[in-house]
Regions:
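Accessory helical subdomains and C-terminal extensions of nucleic-acid helicases
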Residues: 45-49, 103-236, 295, 314-335, ...
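Conserved helicase motor core of SF1/SF2 NTP-dependent helicases
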Residues: 1-5, 13-16, 147, 257-263, ...
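Conserved helicase core region in the C-terminal RecA-like lobe
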Residues: 56, 115, 213-263, 280, ...
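Conserved RecA-like helicase motor-core motifs
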Residues: 71-82
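Helicase P-loop NTPase motor core
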Residues: 1-73, 97-101, 165-169, 347
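C-terminal accessory regions
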Residues: 257-334, 344-349
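Conserved short internal alpha-helix adjacent to the catalytic or cofactor-binding core
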Residues: 80-116
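Short, conserved phosphate/pyrophosphate- and ester-handling motifs at nucleotide-, phospho-/glycolipid
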Residues: 3-7, 120, 245
């Protein structure tokens, strides 16, 4: 039923070749990161074949981080992806570096315009030159510049004060502070860039007491992935693409949320290309579900849009049966409430 709704799909009739397995399990969580906590609890006692499938390899990184810390074996089949080399990861690590060393003019020039403070390139270059000449921070040099507007000086001082607070936070809080309080999310939204990587970074930072440890942890995780590609562990972490043609006894679909899978919800698809991408996302979600041989578990995140999972929930047999029962009950009630029909008058009585 799910894949049959794809408008660009050739009509096919799919018939099962085996009996019914266990019903689809829906795990309801409040937030995206709660999926990782649930899966980590599963991983602790995983002794039989269990696959966690996802669209983007970065979705698995918080779970991999926890498994590494706890010494839980796993097999990773997702490739390196683009997460570690992405501009967003580079920006966050640069901002953390600047928070620890406000004299790093090279880093400052890479990020000064991403905080929402209207610093011109000429002003930024002057601040760097003055910082190197006088040995002061770039913020001190900028705020002391002749002709700087009072409002800009106040904004720069506030930004410098905010960055100075970062080293006293854990890395997860620091990522969220940069994102929400220091303007980085607004910058990404203005550029129409994906903000999903920010949540992954924040989750990875939760177990790091200070932000300065985050860049090193990212490098460590990047190297770790290469060491688990051929592991024989029962816990398998794989992209859906890598799982095509394979089946697993038990499957969990991770991050089936709007913005990830699908990349864009159906209501937001306007152009033919966007619609085709949405249909491709439907097929990918279907592929993920059908990798389950015996058990399938989906997450429904209350704090996120989950249009594909909602559609599955709507069409679960028990929900369809309940709707049909309600419709029948409403029909019976309407029939009972209707006034009795008037008897027909014989034609012979009509004058």
């Amino acid at each position: 039923h799910f894949v049959a709704r794809s408008r660009y799909r050739r009509p096919k009739t799919i018939r099962p070749t085996r009996g019914a397995g266990a019903p689809v399990q829906i795990v309801r969580v409040a937030r995206r990161e709660d999926q990782t906590r649930h899966l980590f609890d599963i991983a602790k006692t995983c002794h039989s074949e269990t696959a966690v499938l996802f669209r983007n390899h970065e979705s698995a990184l918080p779970l991999i981080d926890l498994c590494e810390r706890a010494g839980i074996p796993y097999c990773y089949r997702g490739g390196e992806g683009t997460f570690f080399g992405s501009k967003i990861v580079r920006d966050i690590t640069d901002m953390i570096t600047l928070a620890y060393d406000a004299r790093d003019t090279e880093v400052f020039m890479r990020v000064y315009y991403k905080f929402g403070v209207p610093i011109s390139r000429v002003q930024a270059q002057y601040a760097c030159e003055e910082s190197r000449r006088a040995g002061c921070t770039v913020w001190q040099a900028l705020c002391a510049a002749d002709g700087i507007r009072h409002r800009l000086r106040l904004q720069a001082e506030e930004l410098a004060h905010g960055l100075a607070r970062l080293p006293r936070m854990n890395a997860g809080d620091a990522v969220r502070f940069l994102t929400e309080e220091l303007g980085y999310r607004k910058y990404l939204e203005q550029k129409s860039m994906d903000t999903g990587k920010l949540e992954i970074l924040a989750q990875l930072g939760e177990n790091l007491p200070v932000p300065s440890l985050l860049p090193g942890r990212l490098q460590s995780l990047q190297m770790t992935l290469k060491q688990h590609a051929n592991s024989g562990a029962p816990l398998i972490l794989s992209t859906i693409h890598s799982a095509k043609g394979l089946e697993y006894d038990r499957v969990f679909l991770l991050d089936a949320i709007d913005g990830v899978l699908p990349a864009r919800p159906e209501i937001a698809c306007q152009t033919p290309d966007e619609i085709r991408q949405y249909e491709e996302d439907r097929r990918l979600f279907y592929v993920g579900m059908t990798r389950a041989r015996d058990e399938l578990t989906l997450f429904f995140c209350a704090g996120e849009g989950c249009s594909f999972v909602q559609e599955v929930i709507y069409n679960l047999p028990e929900n369809r049966a309940r709707r049909e029962a309600e419709q029948q009950a409403q029909a019976r009630a309407a029939t009972a409430a209707a006034p009795p029909a008037r008897p027909a008058v014989p034609l012979s009585d009509v004058t």
